[in-house]
């Protein structure tokens, strides 16, 4: 960055070329051993074109530039990603592994759940009266079964049950409450979390505008459009913490030009957006993107007109 301080403003390909390919050119000779680069959640990276561009570049680092790199890429098998891997350039240098039940994910999920609940108990001294280990093994068995091999299900449960300001036993009871109308256990979990949303603000509106505007570093834009007070969005999103990523800094704050500012967290998993966009799955929590795009346009023009009038 000292040699090229404007690098962060360049295209992704220029950045990758500079930071990876050009960097290896300074090494002579090249290392004899290969280095492993792990890329998880490729399907959640920006947009389809970007994802395919990343795969093309990674392929060229091996086939064209002959760099001593190996990649472990984790992704949902979206059609455009499968198409990229089916192209000859990638097909001949890759190996595919389907993470199905043969890998026994339930065993790892069980360990994850037991460890997560143990940490919740250690953090909440009020739970010391409960018989340990808490919860009982039968509940762990049920949660492992419901997870269907999906770690996101188990991770969301641990975040939901262990959320601050809530009673873990009550939160767990909500998770265990059956919903015969849910299409899947993950959908049921998402619906349950949104159903107990603690704020009086319309949760669907908040989610709809966050997805539509897509400006994580400008929460005040969403606050203006929703008519919120400054800082209110941060408070509102705390009620959705189990569905959001944990930021590097506490409460999603970041240092921006020497000033601590709030950054809207990303959703923890792409499956949550899939749930919101499908009305048959999310029901009353359905987010109609076209509707919110129209609302953003109308409300933005309204705010602009209000600002113009205030200048007169």
Positions of predicted regions on the chain:
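Conserved NB-ARC/NACHT P-loop NTPase core of NLR-like innate immune receptors
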Residues: 1-305, 312
């Amino acid at each position: 960055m000292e040699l090229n301080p404007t690098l962060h403003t360049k295209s992704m390909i220029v950045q990758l070329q500079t930071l990876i390919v050009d960097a290896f050119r300074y090494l002579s000779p090249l290392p004899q051993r290969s280095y492993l680069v792990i890329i998880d959640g490729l399907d959640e990276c920006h947009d389809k074109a970007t994802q395919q561009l990343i795969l093309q570049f990674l392929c060229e680092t091996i086939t064209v530039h002959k760099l001593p790199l190996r990649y472990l890429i984790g992704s949902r098998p979206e059609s455009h990603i499968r198409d990229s891997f089916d192209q000859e350039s990638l097909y001949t240098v890759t190996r595919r592994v389907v993470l199905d039940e043969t890998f026994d994910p339930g065993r790892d999920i069980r360990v994850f759940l037991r460890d997560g609940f143990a940490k919740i108990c250690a953090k909440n001294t009020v739970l010391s009266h409960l018989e340990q280990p808490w919860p009982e093994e039968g509940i762990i068995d049920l949660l492992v079964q419901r997870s269907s091999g999906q770690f996101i299900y188990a991770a969301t449960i641990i975040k939901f049950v262990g959320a601050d300001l809530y009673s873990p036993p009550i939160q767990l009871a909500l998770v265990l409450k059956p919903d015969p109308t849910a299409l899947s256990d993950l959908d049921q979990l998402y619906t349950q979390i949104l159903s107990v949303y603690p704020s009086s603000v319309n949760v669907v509106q908040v989610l709809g505008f966050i997805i539509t505007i897509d400006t994580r570093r400008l929460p005040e834009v969403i606050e203006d459009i929703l008519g919120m007070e400054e800082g209110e969005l941060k408070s509102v999103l705390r009620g959705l913490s189990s569905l959001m990523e944990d930021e590097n800094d506490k409460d999603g704050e970041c240092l921006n030009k020497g000033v601590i500012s709030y950054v809207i967290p990303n959703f923890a998993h792409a499956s949550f957006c899939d749930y919101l966009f499908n009305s048959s799955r999310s029901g009353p929590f359905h987010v109609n993107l076209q509707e919110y795009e129209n609302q953003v346009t109308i409300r933005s023009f309204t705010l602009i007109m209000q600002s113009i009038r205030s200048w007169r």
